[in-house]
Amino acid sequence: MVRIAIAGAAGRMGRNLVKATHQNPLSELGAGSERPESSLVGVDIGELCGIGKQGIVLVDNLEQAVEQFDVIIDFTAPASTLANLALCEQHGKKLVIGTTGFTDAQRQTIEQAAKKIPIVMAPNYSVGVNLVFKLLEKAAKVMGDYCDIEIIEAHHRHKVDAPSGTAIGMGEAIAHAMGNQLSDVAVYAREGITGERSRNEIGFATIRAGDIIGEHTAMFADIGERVEITHKATDRMTFANGAVKAAIWLAEQPAGFYTMIDVLGLNDL
């Protein structure tokens, strides 16, 4: 049984992670944390998340419960995730990262830590999205040289980073399949007189509205035809169940930097 701690357990995603951990027969809830200023610190996590009293209360720092878990699942914010990364390094714990919006320097810090501890980091933990990443690699190799490529993503009004980590992951899959770095070909905004579109660029469009959980489309457009590969999420439990699956898988892995592609065994697809 893998003991899991949920960072940000009182948030929208955190509550789903608590439920997914509780429902999976291979995992159990070990701890949960919230920001120190939260009025929910000290509340029973199970009662908060609707799974019944668990005898585990929210703490404001997972170090207070470090003996109660093997893996942290963190879908919070970059600064909070990096603090939990340091905790995992210090105590030999494992870390599943669903947080997005890291700078290049912060990502390098995570990759460096993975030399000491096992880490799974992915922009999206749904099986469907990770299959889409592989499909995009195939499509890019066939159509990338002659099609215009655009990525459109939509999320709820509360999402704070743009484009989404999943959209960037889609762009990276396409760019790498074509032998490019995304940073060299990405166009994140168009306004005014932009001139003609260059052949190699990958365009991004972002929508923030209502309660959209997550929708992503990659478009390969040629003259006379267009191929679109789309994923639509309708329930956050999709991501939560995938993250718990990753935590259970990670518990048996040596130190290293892994993605959901590794967890699902899709590398050879």
From Swiss-Prot:
Q: Which reaction does it catalyse?
A: (S)-2,3,4,5-tetrahydrodipicolinate + NAD(+) + H2O = (2S,4S)-4-hydroxy-2,3,4,5-tetrahydrodipicolinate + NADH + H(+); (S)-2,3,4,5-tetrahydrodipicolinate + NADP(+) + H2O = (2S,4S)-4-hydroxy-2,3,4,5-tetrahydrodipicolinate + NADPH + H(+)
What are the GO MF terms of this UniProt record?
4-hydroxy-tetrahydrodipicolinate reductase; NAD binding; NADP binding; oxidoreductase activity, acting on CH or CH2 groups, NAD or NADP as acceptor
> Does the keyword Amino-acid biosynthesis belong to this entry?
yes
Q: Does the keyword Nucleotide-binding apply?
A: no
**Positions with a binding annotation for NADP(+):** R35
Q: In the UniProt record, which is one GO cellular component term?
A: cytosol
EC assignment: the record states 1.17.1.8
- Report the SS bond pairs: none
Q: What's a BP term from Gene Ontology annotated to this protein?
A: lysine biosynthetic process via diaminopimelate
A Pfam family: DapB_N
Pathway(s) the chain acts in: Amino-acid biosynthesis; L-lysine biosynthesis via DAP pathway; (S)-tetrahydrodipicolinate from L-aspartate: step 4/4
InterPro entries xrefs = DapB_C, DapB_N, DapB_N_CS, DHDPR_bac, NAD(P)-bd_dom_sf
Q: What class of enzyme is it?
A: oxidoreductase
Active site per database record: H155 (proton donor/acceptor), K159 (proton donor)
Binding-site residues for (S)-2,3,4,5-tetrahydrodipicolinate, renumbered to this chain: H156, G165, T166
> Where is the protein found, in the record's own terms?
Cytoplasm
Assigned keywords, A-Z:
Amino-acid biosynthesis, Cytoplasm, Diaminopimelate biosynthesis, Lysine biosynthesis, NAD, NADP, Oxidoreductase
Where on this chain does NAD(+) bind? G8, A9, A10, G11, R12, M13, E34, G98, T99, T100, A122, P123, N124, Y125
Note the NCBIfam families from the entry: dapB
Q: Which PANTHER family match?
A: 4-HYDROXY-TETRAHYDRODIPICOLINATE REDUCTASE 1, CHLOROPLASTIC-RELATED (PTHR20836:SF0), DIHYDRODIPICOLINATE REDUCTASE (PTHR20836)
The protein depicted here goes by the name 4-hydroxy-tetrahydrodipicolinate reductase
Gene source species: Vibrio cholerae serotype O1 (strain ATCC 39315 / El Tor Inaba N16961)
Its taxonomic placement starts with: Bacteria, Pseudomonadati, Pseudomonadota, Gammaproteobacteria, Vibrionales
What gene is behind this protein?
dapB
